[in-house]
A protein has these predicted regions:
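Substrate-binding pocket helix/loop in short-chain dehydrogenase/reductase
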Residues: 38-40, 44-49, 143-146
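Active-site helix of classical SDR
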Residues: 63, 98, 106
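Residue(s) in the substrate-gating loop at a strand-loop-helix junction
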Residues: 82
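Short, small/polar-rich loop/turn modules that mediate ligand/substrate recognition or access, typified
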Residues: 114, 119, 177-179
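Short C-terminal tail/terminal secondary-structure segment
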Residues: 37, 87, 166-167, 178-192
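Active-site loop-to-helix junction immediately N-terminal to the catalytic Tyr of the SDR YXXXK motif
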Residues: 43, 88-96, 108
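Catalytic Tyr-x(3-8)-Lys segment
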Residues: 140-160
Length: 192
């Protein structure tokens, strides 16, 4: 819940983490606000900025401010993106734009930071969360157009099916994996 786009706030979070734990081994950027469900024609600049600032800019700042510490520990970064960007989901223009920006930023960081022993990857999850339930209630048309039961027959479990993969991506067994997008959508995220 430290998703901020203010440099001073982000630096304070990083400083507090160092003060508390003495090091940073991993950064996981997974929080973002957006006006999902609002079409491009009806989107306002404030709605668009909400997604870009809370998603793309916050991810950039946390990566940048944590970099010196990640370099020391040869740490890992996992950034969350979305099928909304991969597939151009209806009514999710600002969310998709922010998430695809995060994917681009992640690939650049993988190229720039690989020499420092830092691996940077992307997870695109589909899990039943309070946010997805709120999206269903607030924008039923967009929900119906975009969210379908995965071939796995259930939505992902946040802790078991998403969280465990994130932990592995931050661990020593996956250090060679760098700049990759992992879709955890129960078969919905199949790509060529």
């Amino acid at each position: 819940s430290a998703g901020q786009d203010n440099e001073a706030v982000v630096q304070n979070v990083i400083d507090k983490a160092i003060e508390e734990f003495g090091r940073i081994d991993a950064v996981v950027n997974n929080a973002q606000a957006s006006a999902s469900g609002v079409t491009i024609a009806d989107h306002t600049m404030d709605q668009f900025n909400l997604a870009i600032y809370s998603g793309l800019y916050a991810t950039y700042l946390y990566m940048q401010k944590a970099y010196p510490h990640l370099k020391e520990t040869k740490g890992s970064v996992v950034n969350f993106a979305s099928g909304a960007g991969l597939f151009g989901n209806y009514g999710q223009c600002s969310y998709a734009a922010a998430k695809e920006g995060i994917r681009g930023l992640t690939r650049v960081a993988a190229n720039e930071w690989g020499k420092d022993g830092i691996n940077v990857n992307i997870v695109c999850p589909l899990a039943w969360t309070a946010a997805l339930e709120n999206f269903q209630d607030a924008y039923p048309e967009a929900f119906k157009a975009n969210v379908h039961m995965p071939p796995a027959g259930h939505y992902g479990d946040v802790e078991k099916e998403i969280g465990r993969v994130v932990v592995q991506l931050c661990g020593p067994d996956f250090k060679y994996m760098n700049g990759e997008t992992v879709t955890l959508e129960g078969g919905m995220g199949q790509r060529p």
